[in-house]
Structures are given as structure tokens and as C-alpha cells.
């Protein structure tokens, strides 16, 4: 990740198997949460520069308000889960993991 103070911009370099599906992958891999946290920490916009692993095509993806709001919602849920487990001591861990023998 690069923080460009003169341009007030955070640049995150990512790779993908398919640049045409990067937008959905960004939600799947919680890049919306990352973008929200970084934008709050540094008070700067964030862009993703994406390289397709197969074609080497480049993509530049900025973050919409909707994308950042999605990240904010996910972060709020994570904070609530943390508080439930570690602050309040009343969380139910069983909903967050699976335990099996291989």
C-alpha cells in the first residue's frame, strides 16, 4: 500500500484472476472494509490498482460511497462481535466457527 501525502491518496495494488469480476471479488475479500478503515485512518481517498494475473491488464478502481458504507457496516458488525465476546463476555462463539476432525 502507498500513502501519497501530496496527492492525498492511498493506492493499494492488488492482483486478480479476472479483472472483469474484481468488483464482486472486492466485496468477497472485504476490500470495502479495508477501504473504509484506511479512509478513516488517513482521511484520504483510496484507489485500487489491479493487475490481471493472466492477461496483465491493468484496472483502476475508486471507491463509491456505497462501497465505503458497506465497509463501514462490516466493521461495525466486527466491533460489535468483539465487544460481545471480549468486553461484555456474552457472545456465542459457536456461530462463528466449525470444529471437525480431518
PLM segments and residue spans:
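Short, glycine/acidic-rich beta->alpha junctions
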Residues: 29-33
Amino acid at each position: 500500500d502507498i500513502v501519497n501525502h501530496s496527492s492525498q491518496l492511498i493506492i493499494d495494488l492488488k492482483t486478480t484472476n479476472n479483472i472483469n469480476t474484481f468488483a464482486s471479488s472486492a466485496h468477497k475479500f472485504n476490500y470495502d472494509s479495508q477501504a473504509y478503515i484506511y479512509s478513516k485512518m488517513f482521511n484520504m481517498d483510496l484507489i485500487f490498482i489491479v493487475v490481471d494475473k493472466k492477461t496483465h491488464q491493468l484496472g483502476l478502481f475508486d471507491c463509491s460511497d456505497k462501497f465505503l458504507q458497506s465497509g463501514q457496516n462490516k466493521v461495525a458488525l466486527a466491533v460489535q462481535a468483539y465487544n460481545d465476546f471480549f468486553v461484555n463476555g456474552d457472545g456465542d462463539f459457536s456461530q462463528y466457527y466449525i470444529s471437525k476432525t480431518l
